[in-house]
């Protein structure tokens, strides 16, 4: 029977070998911090739980674009939004603004970058609990084939994704279960009638109640298809989208699912506190996810660098108290707080609209020529800043005023 192994000591431990965990480990290692990453799966990037639809501008600002050959699956300069009654509102931009990446290869790239900087990886090692001492997180207990290993660390960074296990032990707020949606993502072959440079978005309670569905074509003729919903069975909604939706069925009616995955997405904005004595939470586990689209990679990578810089400074100062580590949350709020505030309001607005009001909003957008007004948009992640940019355009300002009236009428 596997036994308990002796305690080993590290300066920093990162829980989770996804993009956020690997980026945290990369920056920690670059700053001279001896770092070990614990990943419960035997292989980085497997299984994949995300479409990998990312902003080119944001990737470039993070030093990750252009990406090596084979990782980018497609680039996009257009989007078609389909209302519940199949009114289509289209945006065609002047240049490609987003790309999709092969998540397995993307995750492996970030892990190899961290390894090259000096980080150690323990694959097939599941962190089961924290080592606690007098209110301080002092490391982790990790389970693997040969037993349970206790690893002491000055700072532990939780980047394990959607989970509240370690948050509870560290005394931090849990993820808000009321703000979760449940997603299904599939890779499909034999797709037809798609624009290769356009993402398709489908809205309506019959197909994705409380969120939306998407079709993202790949250059090889396949596509990534998915949706999320607040209630109901995501797999049943996916079948309905593929074979019953008047627009999507023309794209997917003869397609075949070759891979499928299920996961949850948090839309409630960052948890109230992301730090404790000897402990930081970053990425999905801290709900650093866009409330509008559910995308978490770019904001997670942004916060990962801040987490690493804060942890390294704390270790150098010999002070890993919550008071010192609290600067991590303050810096993240300075960088992203305005955008989160705008997106949370936008999410409440979207949730308040009936299908009928969404259809009317689409017609108004087309009538005002909003698609033309947005053709030079490049910023899609930092949506508070996008809002300020939109307000300089007459058509956008008029549409936003209309949406505000819709919101007020839905929230007396």
Regions from the PLM with identified roles:
Residues 55-109:
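A conserved beta-strand/loop capping segment in the N-terminal third of enzymes
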Residues 127-129, 233-310, 316, 322-326:
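FAD/FMN-dependent oxidoreductases across multiple families
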Residues 20, 43, 163:
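Conserved Rossmann-like nucleotide-cofactor binding loop
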Residues 12, 33-35, 156:
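Hydrophobic anchor at the start of a short beta-strand
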Residues 26-49:
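Glycine-rich FAD pyrophosphate-binding loop
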Residues 7-20:
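Beta1/beta-strand and adjacent pyrophosphate-binding region of the FAD-binding site
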Residues 312-412:
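C-terminal helical "tail/cap" subdomain of flavin- and related membrane-associated enzymes
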Residues 113-253, 287:
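Predominantly flavin-linked oxidoreductase catalytic cores and closely associated redox partners
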């Amino acid at each position: 029977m596997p036994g308990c192994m002796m305690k080993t000591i590290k300066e920093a431990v990162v829980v989770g070998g996804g993009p956020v965990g690997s980026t945290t480990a990369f920056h920690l290692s670059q700053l001279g911090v001896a770092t070990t990453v614990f990943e419960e799966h035997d292989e980085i990037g497997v299984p994949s739980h995300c479409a990998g639809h990312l902003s080119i501008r944001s990737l470039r600002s993070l030093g990750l674009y252009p990406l090596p050959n084979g990782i980018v699956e497609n680039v996009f300069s257009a989007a078609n939004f389909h209302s519940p009654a199949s009114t289509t509102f289209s945006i065609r931009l002047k240049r490609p603004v987003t790309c999709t990446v092969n998540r397995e290869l993307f995750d492996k790239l970030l892990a190899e970058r961290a390894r090259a900087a000096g980080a150690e990886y323990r694959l097939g090692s599941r962190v089961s609990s924290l080592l606690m001492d007098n209110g301080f997180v002092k490391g982790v207990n990790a389970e693997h084939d040969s037993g349970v290993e206790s690893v002491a660390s000055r700072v532990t960074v939780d980047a394990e994704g959607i989970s509240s296990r370690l948050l509870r032990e560290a005394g931090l707020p849990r993820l808000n279960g009321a703000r979760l949606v449940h997603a299904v993502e599939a890779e499909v072959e034999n797709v037809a009638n798609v624009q290769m440079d356009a993402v398709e978005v489908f809205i309506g309670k019959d197909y994705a109640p409380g969120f939306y569905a998407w079709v993202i074509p790949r250059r090889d003729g396949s596509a990534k298809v998915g949706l999320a919903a607040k209630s109901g069975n995501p797999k049943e909604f996916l079948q309905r989208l593929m074979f019953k939706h008047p627009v999507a069925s023309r794209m997917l009616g003869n397609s075949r699912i070759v891979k499928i995955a299920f996961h949850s997405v948090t839309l409630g904005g960052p948890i109230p506190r992301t730090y404790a004595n000897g402990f930081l939470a970053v990425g999905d586990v801290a709900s650093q996810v866009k409330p509008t689209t559910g995308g978490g990679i770019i904001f997670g990578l942004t916060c990962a660098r801040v987490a690493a810089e804060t942890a390294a400074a704390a270790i150098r100062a010999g002070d890993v108290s919550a008071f010192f580590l609290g600067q991590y949350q303050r810096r993240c709020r300075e960088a992203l707080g305005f955008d989160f505030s705008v997106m949370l309001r936008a999410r409440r607005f979207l949730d308040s609209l009936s299908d009928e009001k969404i259809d009317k909003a689409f017609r108004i957008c087309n009538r005002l020529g909003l698609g033309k007004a947005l053709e030079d948009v490049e910023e899609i992640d930092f949506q508070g800043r996008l809002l300020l940019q939109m307000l300089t355009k007459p058509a956008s300002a008029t549409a936003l005023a209309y949406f505000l009236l819709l919101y007020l009428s839905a929230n007396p």
